[in-house]
Amino acid sequence: MEKRRLLSLDAFRGYTIASMILVNFPGNWEHVFGQLRHTEWFGLTFTDLIAPFFLFIVGVSVTLAYRKRLEEGITRRSMYAKIFYRALKIFLAGMLLNILGILDNFSFSELRWTGTLHRISIVFLVCALIYLNTGWKKQTVIAASLLTGYWLAMVLIPTPGYGKPMLEPGINLAAWIDNKFLPGKMWQGTWDPEGILSTFPSIATGITGMLAGTWLTGKADWERKVTGL
């Protein structure tokens, strides 16, 4: 039977990859449009959306892949090993890239244990397990809880050593956790954009993609689907 692809997802994936190339290779780093740079801290630029787009795509892909397997009668238990294996491969690919970056002067103290592929692997793993064991209503609750919990932690829990919640880079709760528990080197020295605490809202982004995938593969007509998105 011919495999039907979700063309909108293919187009969005291509758009995201093209955007990533544009952001990473603007041509002249001395003259770059502001929207092609990451915001210093507060605020949002087009560049800041690229990584969340990839995580959203991961979520949609999880729905498309494992919904079909469930419809084919494949048991959840038989899918778990493959899910863990795929996540491990993505994580190790990220580690390999980090190792190659410091290969000439390798040191574990200079090795970064986080990155984009690492985050994608974790989001994929968690989202796939959530999808196989919950419905869309529980998924919505989980995503909302992750976002709310992250926000409350950042604005209510005092950063150790400061006595009050801090939101500035390098001294907030997320940075403190990364400094306390992450081995090796962090991307920004005192904090990491793919650190431990920020993984939770990233998972919520993946779940949002799952919900979109569920909606797109539903029985509603396309006009209603577009309106619903």
Q: Where in the sequence are the language-model features?
A:
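Hydrophobic cores of alpha-helical transmembrane segments in multi-pass inner/ER membrane proteins
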Residues: 51-62, 120-132, 201-213
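Membrane-interface interhelical loops and short amphipathic "cap" helices
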Residues: 26-45, 76, 100-114, 164-174, ...
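Transmembrane alpha-helical segments and their boundary/interface "anchor" motifs
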Residues: 48-53, 68-98, 102, 108-109, ...
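N-terminal signal-anchor module of multipass membrane proteins
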Residues: 1-71, 75-79
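Transmembrane helix-loop junctions in multipass membrane proteins, especially transporters and channels
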Residues: 28, 68-73, 102-106, 136, ...
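Hydrophobic alpha-helical transmembrane segments of multi-pass membrane proteins
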Residues: 43-53, 113-117, 193-203
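A conserved active-site cap/scaffold subdomain adjacent to cofactor or substrate pockets
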Residues: 193-229
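Long hydrophobic alpha-helical segments that form multi-pass transmembrane helix bundles
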Residues: 136-208
